C-alpha cells in the first residue's frame, strides 16, 4: 500500500483532478451540472482549519503511541521523582541550593533532549510519505512539542515540588517557569539532533556529546568566576550556563555571587536563551524541509 505515495508523486494534484474529471468514473457517478456548480461554489479550506485538523489528528496519534509504550511511559513518569529524591538525599548545609539548582537545570536539559531525540529519526519514512500528501511541518512539530511538553510539565513539577520540601527557593513559581522554558529549548534541540541523525544509534551517540559540555561549562563544576576569560566566552554557547544563571538569580540570589555570575544578567540570559530557541527551531525546520529532497 505504501507504493501509492510514489505513484501519486508522479503527477500534480491538478493533473490528477483533470484525469479524474475525464474518466468514466466521473461521468457515471457525478451529475455534471450539479457537480460544476457545487465545485465552483466550494471554498477551499483555510490554512488555519487545515493546520488545526492536522494538529489534532497528529496529537491524538502521537499521544496514543506514547502511552502504549509502557516502558518509556514508566521511565518518563518515575525518573523525575527519583532524581528529586536523590538531590534531597545528597545535598545539605549552607548554600546547598547552589548545587541543587545546578542538578535541576542539568536534569531539565537532559530530560528534554532525551525525551525528543528518537522522535523524528524513528519515523523518518512515515514523515516523508505523509509529506507527499501535504503534511504541514508546523502541525507536525507542534504535535510533537505538545505531547513532549506535557510530560515535561509533569517532570519539572516533580523536580521543583519535591526538592522545595528541603531547599529554600525564594521564587518557586519563577524557578518552575524558567526550567519549563529551558525544557522547551532542550526539547527543540533534541528534535534537531533527531532530524539530523540517520539512525537512532547515531542520535543516541551524539546526545552525550551535547550534554557533557552542558555539565562542564554550566558554571559549577568549575566556578564561573575561576574560568579564564576565553573559557567564560566559550561557556556562553551552552544553554546550561544561561539557564543556571537565570535560575540562581530568580530563586537563590546568593548563589550568583558564589558562582561569579553577573547579578544584573537576567535580561541578557533571557535574550540569549531566546536566540538559541529560534536558532534551534530554524535549524529543525530547515532539516525537515531538506528531507523532502532526499529519497
Please provide the spans of the model-predicted regions.
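ABC ATPase nucleotide-binding domains
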Residues: 1-37
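Membrane-spanning alpha-helical segments of multipass transporters and channels
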Residues: 1-13, 63-295
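Short, membrane-interfacial amphipathic segments enriched in basic
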Residues: 36-60, 232-239
Amino acid at each position: 500500500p505504501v507504493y501509492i505515495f510514489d505513484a501519486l508523486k508522479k503527477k500534480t494534484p491538478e493533473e490528477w483532478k483533470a484525469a479524474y474529471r475525464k474518466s468514466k468514473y466521473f461521468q457515471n457517478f457525478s451529475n455534471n451540472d450539479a457537480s460544476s456548480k457545487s465545485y465552483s461554489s466550494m471554498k477551499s479550506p483555510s490554512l488555519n482549519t487545515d493546520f488545526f485538523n492536522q494538529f489534532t489528528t497528529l496529537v491524538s496519534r502521537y499521544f496514543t503511541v506514547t502511552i502504549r509504550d509502557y516502558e518509556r511511559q514508566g521511565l518518563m513518569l518515575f525518573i523525575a521523582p527519583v532524581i528529586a529524591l536523590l538531590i534531597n538525599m545528597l545535598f545539605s548545609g549552607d548554600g546547598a541550593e547552589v548545587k541543587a539548582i545546578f542538578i535541576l537545570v542539568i536534569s531539565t536539559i537532559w530530560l528534554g533532549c532525551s525525551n525528543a531525540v528518537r522522535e523524528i529519526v524513528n519515523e523518518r519514512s512515515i514523515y516523508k510519505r505523509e509529506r507527499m500528501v501535504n503534511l504541514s511541518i508546523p502541525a507536525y512539530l507542534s504535535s510533537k512539542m505538545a505531547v513532549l511538553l506535557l510530560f515535561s510539565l509533569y517532570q519539572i513539577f516533580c523536580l521543583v515540588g519535591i526538592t522545595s520540601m528541603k531547599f529554600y527557593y525564594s521564587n518557586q513559581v519563577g524557578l518552575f517557569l524558567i526550567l519549563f522554558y529551558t525544557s522547551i529549548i532542550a526539547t527543540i534541540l533534541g528534535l534537531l539532533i533527531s532530524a539530523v541523525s540517520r539512525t537512532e544509534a547515531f542520535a543516541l551517540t551524539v546526545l552525550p556529546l551535547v550534554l557533557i559540555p552542558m555539565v562542564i561549562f554550566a558554571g559549577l563544576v568549575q566556578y564561573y568566576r575561576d574560568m579564564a576569560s576565553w573559557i567564560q566566552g566559550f561557556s556562553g554557547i551552552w544553554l546550561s550556563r544561561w539557564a543556571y544563571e537565570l535560575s540562581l538569580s530568580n530563586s537563590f540570589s546568593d548563589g550568583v555571587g558564589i558562582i561569579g555570575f553577573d547579578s544584573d544578567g537576567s535580561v541578557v540570559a533571557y535574550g540569549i536563551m531566546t536566540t538559541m530557541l529560534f536558532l534551534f527551531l530554524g535549524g529543525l525546520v530547515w532539516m525537515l524541509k531538506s528531507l523532502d529532497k532526499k529519497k
